[in-house]
Amino acid sequence: MVDFNDLSVELKKTELIKEDLRNLSHIINNEFSYFCQNENKNVSFNNNISSYYNDDIFSKSTLNNLYTSWKLEDFSHFDFSSILDILKRNQYVMCSIYFLLIFSCIYFLTLLLYTKCIKTTLKKWFCRYCSENINENNSNHNEQRTVLQNVINKSCYFITYSSIICLLLFLLLSGITYMHYFIKTKKGIHSNICNIYTRLDKFLLNKCLDPKKVDTSCYSAEHILNDLSSILEEYKKVKQQAKDDTLLDENTPFPLLERYITTFNKLNVLKNNINKNNTTLENEYFHTYPALKGISETLTTIISEGNKNFGNARNVIKEVKSTIKYSFHTVDETIRNVFKDSVPKITGLITQAGKSIKGINNKYKIKERIPKYTNIILLTNIILLLPPFLILLGIIIFMIFILMGYIQKNNNFFIKLFGHFSAYFGLLTIIILSFGILFLSTSVIGGTSCILSERILKNELRFDILNNTLIDYCIKNESAPLIDDDITTSFVAKINSFDTGHIDHNINEYEKHFTILKESFFHKSLKFMDYIWIVIMKRENNTFLNRIRTEQVKKSLLITGIINENIKYENMEAIGIRSYLTTLNKIIFPENNGKICFNDIICEKENNTYNITENSKTTDQKYRNIRDGMDEHLRNDLDAIVQLFVYKARILKENIFDINDLDSNEKNKIGWSEYTPRNINGTQKKSIINTFLVNVIESINFSEIINFFDKMRDQFNVLKDLILLKIDTLTENTKCNKLVKELINVRKDYCNNVVLNLSTLSVYLIIFSITSFLLWYLFLFLWFYYNIKPS
């Protein structure tokens, strides 16, 4: 059994590989499970690839106009300059960049206005211009105009500050919105990484909702190893069973054949038991089993005919043993070759996957860097939004004080801060617009990759770089298997070469002998089975029967059973005790001055009656009284009849039959109702004789040997079917459409959850920066107006 032990070693190797998979899954889980917090991932699977685009939000988004600046030549030699070319052709990116450059120059120039020298010069020039206008328009109505001017000033304050408040509110709203989309983008990145991690984990280990059910969406390397293990386990079981059944050693007696010989001895035991108990019934109780005597004769024929087929059985078993040994040799070679060719490839893929994941982990530190940088950016944005919020509160309070008259125009200390506000919003515009351009550029490149990948996956666009690759092959052949057809075809051919047809022919040839034997037995003996419980009077050497002189009484007594009912079987009829006694009472008591009954408690209580039981005697006084009242020539006949009926009652009550030779656990004798139970109202009660006989006959039938080898052949077929099933499962669950669907899912998660949110985020950042620019301009104007004009 060297081959058997070698396969056990291979089985241990598969377990070690599975352990490596679990360790690798643990490493991936430690690194990437962080991104799956609060995620409920249930990856669905659909055979229709087109349905995977139904929920593709990216393809239907109006933001697709942002991603139209690419050309095919950009990807002929894709590098950093290609990215710059795409961005240069994007009008939105370039407009934002130009605006940023121009505004930055203007902003830094306006900072000169806050210097004391420039501020003094501008104020002198403005004051000179104002003085000339004031002298020309000076009049005697200054007092009335002062009231009107105050009203106009307050209205101007209200309108101006209301505009500022609206812009600040819009700024905060756009800021909150872009923070919302920033968080969505962050979650999208987490979700995308989580999806990739989940799919990698499902590729390694069995993560199906029902671990026992193979699902294409979660078919994994562990499934492949489990399939290999199940093939080995099934093969070990078949081979071990063959070893236990001595099928691998032609010199060892075949157990079933030994049982076959033992079975014939059991038939002799049964025959002897029937003869022994029937002899007891005849000699001690003057009754007999007519059906059992027929069965005994049939057993003699069965034993004689069965022995003739023993030689045939020996020859067919020898031939089958030789065939099974050859089949095991073929299976051993096939499985060994499969392990030799396939296991290194699988382990190589697993090892390479582990190295790649560890390399990405060590190089990029994804888990640490992504949360770190996203949190820093988010915190920075929150800090940048705090000053606009405080300015908004300050202006609202300032407006309230102006309306209430607490602050005069010459005492507007808050207005002095407008220069600082302008400087802040200008700087905020530059910072936010820079972020916006960065995110917009990233989203443009990301969106371009989404559009290209969609067209590639739909086989609408091809790149030379993908030629002769697995992805290119699978896109063109969605239903093609990833595994080479030659591997599965050659393997299936080897498995299907296991031809057991010649075994079937030989076994079926010898089966005919035993089929004829079985049919002969059931034809001869089954007709007795329903009536083996019938007991009638013994004809030969029956002392009591011979005493009866009245022929009318004696003849019907011969076929009277031991039960009350009449029984018909075959072409014979057994008279029931009730019928017989009714006729007997009419004969011996024509004047109804007496009555004989049998096991009848009610009758026993009546006058001029005698109830026969197992304890009855012809010397009983009640019987003597009835006997004395009948014709004298019938009295001796009645005595004999009563004594025979006492034996009938004893047969019904006493334990007569010894079955220890049939059942070694049964030491005590049993009664008639147990030895040969009666079938009443269609109820089938199996006697120990019936059960023993049928079981023995079935067991000696060669069909048991046939069934055994059918079972062995079925086990080989189960092994073959299992291997074919696992190959089909592997092929079906590793088709190209699975790879394409996984790529579509990764693309869809990336484009919908990351690129689209990032594009929306960049739009709101630009809106925010434009609003900040307007606030910069407004505060700069107000500062210039209030600080340069004369008091």
From Swiss-Prot:
The chain crosses the membrane at residues 93-113, 163-183, 382-402, 425-445, 764-784. It is found in: Cell membrane. GO terms for cellular component: membrane. Residues 225-284 form a coiled coil. Induction: Expression is modulated by the levels of iron ions in the environment. Glycans are attached at residues 23, 42, 48, 137, 153, 278, 467, 477, 541, 607, 611, 681, 701, 757. The keyword Transmembrane applies. It is a multi-pass membrane protein. The keyword Cell inner membrane does not apply. Keywords: Cell membrane, Coiled coil, Glycoprotein, Membrane, Transmembrane, Transmembrane helix. Disruption phenotype: Conditional knockdown results in decreased growth rates of blood stage parasites that can be rescued by the treatment with hepcidin, a specific ferroportin inhibitor causing an increase in labile iron levels in erythrocytes. Putative iron transporter. This is Putative iron transporter.
